[in-house]
């Protein structure tokens, strides 16, 4: 997973207008339109057959990525609704193998000057994509998924909705072995106690170990998140048929 760095809005917005010029598409203008959620620009360019809904656009951290992933990364809800309605590929991937729902589950709005963080737009993006049928599990081998990203970022609303929609609490783990960090491990390494609790209540197995690596508890202790130790140790102690709620709460 790569946490992507922002580039200036001015670079994105340059040359962007709701009434697009005719002729070949300007990639920077397209990226700028998505960044400011200008659905009119995007729709007009699609209807003019200058682009398709599955074309790429420049976005935060990429020279080019599928439009739906750029849209999800920006939390551009109007453009996202349009792309979904226009049958864009919901499971298209960035060069880092991230899908739109994964990016929507990871990021948030941050206003550092006001010390304000909001997940509202991104929570809605997760809902839109999940309700439209986006694949919640990563079909590529040894790759992260949306639930893991939500756990890593402490995105509780997104995490709970993904679980409600059927996301697997243990990811792709089998026989208590995983070849990529499980959602519980992702929460543990970041010290996200509430996310860890939600996952344990949903049946996440605290005894899963990364192949030749660590368990969720070991990740937590390695990163000095001792406030997770009690719940993860209790999770490890569950006997067959026991639930986290019945034994640990």
Feature map (PLM): residue ranges:
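Sec-dependent signal peptide recognition
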Residues: 1-7
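C-terminal motif of bacterial Sec signal peptides marking the signal peptidase cleavage site
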Residues: 14-15
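Bacterial lipoprotein signal-peptidase II cleavage site
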Residues: 18-22
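Ankyrin repeat A-helix N-terminal signature
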Residues: 32-37, 70-76, 103-122, 149-155, ...
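Terminal, low-structured helical/coil segments at or just beyond the last alpha-helical repeat
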Residues: 219-249
